[in-house]
């Protein structure tokens, strides 16, 4: 989309590149206004000489010009509809079902900011915002001092004050108006003459928009190379500056020693180095070498803009201004590979390569991308039916690339040649060439989709109908993962690498997710709240586990309804041995130990028969005879005694103790 620009200049003798020659009849009112120009003041005559350069939009298919972007887009829809009708007609003649070629329906890409938009109406509304932004940036430039002004009134006041002060005493005599020329005959629309397109970088003229775009692509490649090699040149310049400073110090020291020894003139000793190309003199050989490299090098002709701090040269003032930000804001260095970047955002994007991060992942193939736009463009490759299909069999997801490709079948340029008229009708209509045979379609046995290749069919069955595969395996332990980024994170468990460090406590982690989860403990944020009791948690998994405490046991009428509780987080942990459900994994683990112990006892081999244990000893009865707290006698017997016999034994023992003898019991008595 062409950018809307308004420029202020004198009435040119030739048309600017890209303008259209148009002649309009001069009315009587305009003749009267032209005769009154001689009575204007110099400022009014200067203000009346302003003109606005009007840009038009050209159709990339037929070269037609339109004043607004809406007219161009509506006109290009006719080309798309004509192509779709022609393809449908050819397929009906062969006997095949017409293949739907999408026209205006589908995502469109903005040429200014590369944003994807779904409908033409939204695209027009989106590009109107760009037009309003560009319209607010119109400025008027003085052709003598190159100063910019936001309004024509300020521009006229500037011209009166600065550049017309010398001619105020003598008012300029306006040139006589040329006599009115007869109106030329109206030219047919097909004979519109187009001026060549001029490149703003190198002023190269191109005949067609396609050649102009191809030529500008070379400047983009050189710009990328310059930005890529800019840091290397800065490092080399810094090293050379250090060497030159050392040489300068050595030469100055030698000059001082020579002056002291010889006693020469100090005024001529410091200017001994002269430049061979210009009359300038330098104080040392290092300064002379630096002067010749910046002023007389071959690159100085094509890079006239020089940096005052590092003496680097650039081809445009915009690149010099962008380079100056590196001196103002400082450079950003990578701590891993010591690479230097001008912006902090570029350094952050570079650090993701070391960390192996991929913020946007494709769910079909597991590839990671740094931006959402690249992921959306990649996702189109997994679709079964592409948006745009050419007759030659090539498919395109971008409408602009599809239109550019179609021109290769018709010729170099899509615009008609200058002065060309409508081609004469052929005497005999030639039959259209037969369309190429459509590629073989492989239907999916599980759904109604069909694919042109076996690889796309297998990818579709694996992604849609098959179980989740773990195609990426660890080379150390053989564990499988769904995505490649998971393998990279898993390898850190083998290497012991923990590159993510907490700035608050210094603790390191193996993944960025674990670091983010840990940082919540320092901030005190608990974003997950229970709706029943109001308790807050730092992680959603802890909240889900806490929610099970509020759930009541559910009774089912039939046994087959019991496993459904696992789907609704009622009791998600199930024992496969006895069929019991548990709300926590810890309870399931404790329960499984019971089954493990039972299996251990069952699997133990039978022991050999052991000898019979000896009979237990006969029970003995102990009788203690006491008097006044003192033990008189202890009687042990293997048979229980009656109360009368026990009293007799105690009296006998008491009498024996008084007599000073021993009591002997007869076994027959006992």
UniProtKB/Swiss-Prot annotation:
The keyword Cell inner membrane does not apply. Residues 168-196, 217-304, 409-443, 601-621 are annotated as: Disordered. The keyword Transcription applies. It holds the Pfam family zf-C2H2_4. InterPro entries: Znf_C2H2_sf, Znf_C2H2_type. A zinc finger (C2H2-type) spans 57-79, 108-130, 140-163, 197-219, 305-327, 332-354, 360-382, 388-409, 442-465, 472-494, 500-522, 528-550, 573-595. GO terms for molecular function: DNA binding; zinc ion binding. Residues 232-263 have a biased composition (Acidic residues). Residues 217-231 have a biased composition (Basic and acidic residues). Keywords: DNA-binding, Epilepsy, Intellectual disability, Metal-binding, Nucleus, Repeat, Transcription, Transcription regulation, Zinc, Zinc-finger. Residues 171-189, 423-442, 606-619 have a biased composition (Pro residues). Widely expressed. Gene3D superfamilies: Classic Zinc Finger (3.30.160.60). GO terms for cellular component: nucleus. Changing residue 160 to T: In DENNED; uncertain significance. SMART domains: ZnF_C2H2. It is found in: Nucleus. It is linked to Dentici-Novelli neurodevelopmental syndrome: An autosomal recessive disorder characterized by global developmental delay and impaired intellectual development apparent from infancy. Disease severity is variable. More severely affected individuals have profound intellectual disability, axial hypotonia, peripheral spasticity, prenatal and postnatal microcephaly, early-onset seizures, brain imaging abnormalities, and are unable to walk or speak. Patients with a less severe phenotype may achieve some developmental goals and show less severe intellectual disability. Belongs to the krueppel C2H2-type zinc-finger protein family. May be involved in transcriptional regulation. This is Zinc finger protein 526. It comes from Homo sapiens (Human). The gene is ZNF526.
């Amino acid at each position: 989309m062409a950018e809307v620009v308004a420029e202020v200049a004198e009435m040119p003798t030739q048309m600017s590149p890209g303008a259209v020659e148009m002649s309009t009849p001069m009315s009587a009112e305009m003749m009267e206004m032209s005769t009154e120009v001689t009575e204007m003041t110099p400022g009014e005559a200067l203000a009346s000489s302003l003109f606005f350069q009007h840009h038009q939009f050209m159709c990339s298919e037929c070269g037609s010009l339109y004043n607004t972007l809406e007219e161009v887009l509506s006109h290009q829809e006719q080309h798309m509809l004509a192509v779709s009708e022609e393809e449908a007609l050819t397929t009906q003649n062969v006997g095949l079902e017409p293949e739907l070629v999408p026209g205006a329906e589908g995502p469109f890409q903005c040429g200014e900011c590369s944003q994807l938009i779904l409908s033409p109406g939204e695209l027009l509304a989106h590009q109107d915002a760009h037009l309003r932004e560009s319209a607010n940036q119109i400025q008027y430039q003085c052709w003598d001092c190159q100063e910019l002004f936001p309004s024509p009134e300020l521009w006229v006041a500037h011209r009166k004050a600065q550049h017309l002060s010398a001619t105020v005493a003598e008012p300029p005599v306006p040139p006589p108006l040329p006599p009115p020329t007869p109106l030329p005959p109206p030219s047919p629309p097909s004979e519109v003459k187009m001026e060549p397109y001029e490149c703003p970088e190198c002023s190269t003229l191109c005949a067609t928009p396609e050649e102009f775009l191809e030529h500008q692509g070379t400047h983009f490649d050189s710009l990328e190379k310059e930005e890529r090699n800019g840091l290397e040149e800065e490092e080399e310049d810094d090293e050379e500056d250090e060497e030159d400073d050392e040489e300068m110090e050595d030469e100055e020291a030698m000059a001082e020693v020579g002056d002291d020894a010889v006693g020469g003139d100090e005024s001529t000793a410091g200017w001994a180095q002269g430049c061979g190309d210009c009359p300038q003199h330098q104080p040392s050989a290092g300064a002379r070498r630096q002067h010749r490299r910046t002023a007389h090098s071959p690159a100085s002709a094509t890079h006239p803009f020089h940096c005052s701090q590092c003496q680097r040269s650039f081809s445009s003032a915009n690149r010099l201004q962008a380079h100056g930000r590196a001196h103002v804001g400082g450079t950003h260095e990578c701590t891993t590979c010591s690479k230097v970047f001008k912006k902090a955002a570029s350094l952050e994007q570079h650090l993701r390569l070391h960390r192996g991060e991929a913020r946007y992942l494709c769910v079909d193939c597991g590839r990671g991308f740094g931006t959402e736009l690249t992921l959306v463009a990649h996702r189109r490759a997994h679709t079964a039916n592409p948006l745009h299909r050419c007759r030659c069999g090539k498919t395109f997801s971008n409408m602009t690339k599809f239109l550019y490709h179609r021109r290769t079948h018709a010729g170099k340029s899509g615009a008609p040649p200058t002065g060309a008229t409508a081609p004469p009708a052929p005497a005999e209509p030639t039959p259209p060439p037969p369309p190429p045979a459509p590629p073989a379609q492989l239907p999916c046995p599980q759904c109604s989709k069909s694919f042109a290749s076996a690889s796309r069919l297998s990818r579709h069955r694996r992604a849609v109908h098959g179980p989740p595969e773990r195609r990426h395996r660890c080379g150390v332990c053989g564990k499988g993962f769904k995505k490649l980024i998971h393998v990279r994170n898993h390898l850190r468990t083998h290497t012991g690498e923990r590159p993510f460090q907490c700035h608050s406590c210094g603790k390191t982690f193996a993944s960025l997710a674990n670091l983010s989860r840990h940082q919540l403990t320092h901030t005190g944020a608990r974003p997950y709240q229970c709706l029943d009791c109001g308790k807050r948690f730092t992680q959603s998994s802890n909240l889900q586990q806490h929610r099970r405490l509020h759930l009541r046991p559910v009774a089912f009428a039939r046994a087959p309804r019991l496993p459904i509780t696992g789907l609704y987080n009622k009791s998600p942990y199930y024992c496969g041995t006895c069929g019991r459900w548990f709300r926590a994994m810890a309870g399931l683990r404790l329960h499984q130990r019971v089954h493990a112990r039972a299996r251990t006892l069952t699997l133990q081999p039978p022991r050999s028969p052991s000898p019979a244990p000896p009979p237990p000893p006969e029970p003995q009865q102990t009788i203690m005879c006491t008097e006044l707290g003192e033990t008189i006698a202890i009687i042990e017997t293997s048979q229980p005694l009656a109360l009368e016999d026990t009293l007799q034994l105690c009296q006998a023992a008491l009498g024996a103790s008084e007599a000073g003898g021993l009591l002997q019991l007869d076994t027959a008595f006992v």
